[in-house]
């Protein structure tokens, strides 16, 4: 099931060139960060820990490694939504009920609920700058969790 997303105003994306350009740059910067963390898991761990994480250093490194395994390699490019995964997620969200018997979605998402247009433009920018957006050579690192995650 797909998780996490970046949300934007569809009407503004379609009608406001500056808004769309900002969205493309924002997505490109986000994806560049994920590519950096793919190649520099320890440095990303250090950034998070230095910012005051309540979780310890080894736990943060383990978590970064696990997230990287979910993202990489990204055959279509990092951030591109696979339509089959989207359809599966929408179906689960309409059918799976919580303890109160409610679902996350009460009807199918509109046709414009997601787009790969922005991410594809962002990927083109990153590829032009030499950023590896697919991570075909990614291999997870070995992480040893310390007691208490420290």
List where the protein language model places each region.
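Secondary-structure end/capping motifs
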Residues: 16-103
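Residue-level signal for threonine
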Residues: 9, 82, 115, 119
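Conserved C-terminal helix/tail region of periplasmic/extracytoplasmic solute-binding proteins
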Residues: 90-150
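Short, structured secondary-structure boundary patches
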Residues: 8-14, 78, 122-126
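A bilobed periplasmic-binding-protein/Venus flytrap-type ligand-binding module shared by bacterial periplasmic
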Residues: 2-20
């Amino acid at each position: 099931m797909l998780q996490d997303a970046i949300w934007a105003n569809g009407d503004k994306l379609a009608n406001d060139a500056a808004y769309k350009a900002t969205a493309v740059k924002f997505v490109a910067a986000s994806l560049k960060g994920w590519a950096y963390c793919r190649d520099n898991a320890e440095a990303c761990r250090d950034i998070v820990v230095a910012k005051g994480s309540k979780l310890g250093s080894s736990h943060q490194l383990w978590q970064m490694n696990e997230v990287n395994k979910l993202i990489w390699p990204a055959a279509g490019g990092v951030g591109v939504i696979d339509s089959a995964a989207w359809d599966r997620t929408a179906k689960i969200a309409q059918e799976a009920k919580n303890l109160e018997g409610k679902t996350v979605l009460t009807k199918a998402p509109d046709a414009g609920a997601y787009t790969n247009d922005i991410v594809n433009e962002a990927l083109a920018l990153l590829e032009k700058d030499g950023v590896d957006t697919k991570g075909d050579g990614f291999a997870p690192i070995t992480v040893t969790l310390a007691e208490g995650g420290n």
